[in-house]
A protein has these predicted regions:
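Conserved catalytic alpha/beta core of Sir2/sirtuin-type deacylases, generalized to analogous enzyme cores
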Residues: 2-326
């Protein structure tokens, strides 16, 4: 087991122990009572911390994509209607994940929905917050850790710079995990969507199959399937573990973006531990809803409670003016 994976396992045990607190949207960690800086000063500090850091570890979660329009997972909103309109009208789903939990009458209908879902993320253009983040990281030594499966980061950066610890919509695996192999999902998904047209079911012969056992395939993602924790999965943890351990004596900035209350054990809480443990580490989080900064980190960290797209846009503009050392 790799170093960062061990951290995740430790924080998962905390999550299990205090499940009720997390379910209520809280945290068992003692939070700082230190008042936040005014917003302009927070932006100036963010720009300064990025500039002065030797390296930046970005922890990108669902709130980052949601801030750029990828907010169709949990709500029947304009984005959901744009991409899943026919399903919203017929089934009245309250977001994309609602459809994943639906008991479909046929596998052809299930795959019609799943192909629509995967095609939406696979073909989505780069969202504005990612572009602004890229500008902020220009010229920096950085690494990306993400729980997002929507392929936004790998559209920007080479795979050696990104650890996708919750999977990736570009790949299929055997649904029964009969093999450790993963394979391309992009072309089969495009072909299913093209063959389906306005209908809501794929042809039977197009249902993706495992090339080894002949059973159904499934996207290589955690959340609603039998997630394959094999060589590709371990490679993600190896990348982030190697990066943080090789930079532990550096002035590393852990930059958390959009972590919610369902999965704090994958990015947020391990990063808290690393910030506390590494002598020169700093921590900044941006979250539109939650102001969770442990008291132990109040001198090493900051949380900006604001729309992530706005924060990254404002920080990029500030950095473009030469920043602010205030």
């Amino acid at each position: 087991m790799h170093f960062y994976e061990e951290l995740v396992m430790q924080t998962q045990r905390v999550y299990s122990q205090y499940a009720g607190i997390y379910a209520a949207g809280g945290t068992p960690y003692v939070r700082t009572d230190k008042p936040p800086l005014p917003y302009p000063e927070q932006i100036a500090r963010l720009v300064r911390e990025i500039r002065e850091a030797d390296c930046v570890v970005v922890g990108g979660a669902s709130g980052l994509s949601a801030a750029g329009g990828g907010d169709f997972y949990y709500a029947d909103n304009a984005s959901y209607r744009k991409y899943f309109g026919k399903y919203a009208e017929k089934y009245h789903f309250k977001g994309a994940f609602d459809g994943m939990m639906h008991h479909w009458d046929t596998r052809e209908e299930f795959w019609g929905y799943l192909a629509t879902f995967l095609h939406t993320t696979q073909t989505a253009p780069l969202r504005a917050p990612y572009i602004d983040l890229q500008a902020l990281l220009q010229g920096k030594d950085f690494f990306i850790l993400t729980t997002n499966q929507d392929t936004q980061f790998v559209k920007l950066y080479p795979e050696e710079k990104v650890a996708e610890i919750q999977g990736d919509h570009r790949f299929f695996q055997c649904a029964a995990c009969c093999t450790d192999d993963t394979w391309d999902a992009v072309q089969p998904v495009a072909e299913m969507v093209r063959a389906m047209g306005p209908r809501m079911a794929v042809p039977t012969g197009m249902i993706p199959r495992c090339p080894h056992c002949g059973g159904e395939a499934f996207p290589w993602v955690r959340g609603y399937g039998n997630f394959l924790e094999g060589k590709k999965y371990e490679a993600q943890y190896e990348k982030i573990s190697r990066y943080v351990l090789s930079h532990k004596e550096k002035k590393v900035l852990f930059f958390e973006l959009g972590v919610g209350r369902l999965t704090p054990m994958f990015i947020q809480e391990p990063v808290w531990h690393l910030t506390l443990a590494f002598p020169h580490a700093r921590y900044i989080a941006v979250n539109r809803q939650y102001n969770f900064l442990p008291k132990e980190l109040e001198e090493k960290g900051m949380v900006i409670v604001e729309d992530i797209a706005k924060v990254l846009r404002d920080a990029r503009a500030q950095a473009g003016k030469g920043g602010n050392t205030a």
